[in-house]
């Protein structure tokens, strides 16, 4: 679908040699014992691309206890995306049975504005190129604040007005009827206004 095609495009032509999903994962600073919520998880590529790093962090030891070391809940408004994410992550974690990896995944259909989670449930919420799709960005951020534990962290990403300018011009030159982005989503939540929007909900924005 469109999401998978866009991920391929970014992976194939990005100037960031580290790769987008490894970079996002690095910003999350995941440690043992974390409870994590990803909203708008898509097909689960964030976790599939970083499955080795996650396995290293989640490897069980004598200090881990009986509870799952890392709990990850993936949500998306699309049942199809949740189905894809479940399948992709199941395949990526097939080898974990023999390796004592203490990480659990849960998958649910839910919107950004109504996650269905309890108050103060998560140490980390991830919204990777998602917030600008929400009907009401401020309502979605209120929901994120509600489900984060005190001291919890939101890692979110967006883009700016100059995003993919070169390929947009190339495609437009080929056929002006083709538009890579029908809506200017960066106007809703982008690099130019994102920090201002976030500061209405969070005291510390980096």
Q: What do these predicted ranges mean?
A:
Residues 1-34, 45-49:
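Conserved class I S-adenosyl-L-methionine
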Residues 113-125:
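A short acidic, Gly/Pro-enriched loop at the edge of an enzyme's catalytic core
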Residues 50, 144, 198:
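Class I S-adenosylmethionine-dependent transferase superfamily signal
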Residues 124-138:
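A short SAM/SAH-binding and catalytic strip from SAM-dependent methyltransferases
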């Amino acid at each position: 679908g469109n999401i998978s095609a866009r991920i391929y495009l970014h992976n194939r032509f990005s100037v960031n040699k580290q790769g987008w999903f490894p970079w996002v994962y690095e910003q999350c600073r995941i440690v043992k014992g974390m409870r994590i919520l990803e909203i708008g998880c898509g097909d689960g590529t964030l976790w599939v691309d970083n499955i080795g790093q996650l396995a290293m962090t989640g490897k069980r030891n004598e200090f881990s206890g009986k509870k799952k070391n890392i709990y990850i809940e993936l949500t998306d408004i699309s049942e199809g995306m949740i189905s894809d994410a479940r399948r992709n992550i199941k395949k990526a974690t097939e080898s974990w049975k023999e390796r004592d990896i203490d990480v659990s995944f849960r998958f649910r259909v839910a919107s950004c504005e109504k996650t269905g989670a309890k108050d103060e449930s998560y140490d980390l919420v991830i919204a990777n190129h998602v917030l600008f799709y929400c009907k009401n960005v401020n309502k979605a951020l209120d929901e994120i604040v509600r489900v984060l534990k005190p001291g919890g962290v939101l890692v979110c990403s967006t883009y700016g007005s100059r995003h993919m300018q070169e390929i947009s011009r190339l495609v437009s030159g080929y056929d002006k009827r083709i538009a890579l982005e029908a809506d200017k989503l960066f106007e809703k939540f982008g690099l130019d206004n994102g920090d201002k929007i976030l500061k209405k909900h969070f005291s510390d924005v980096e």
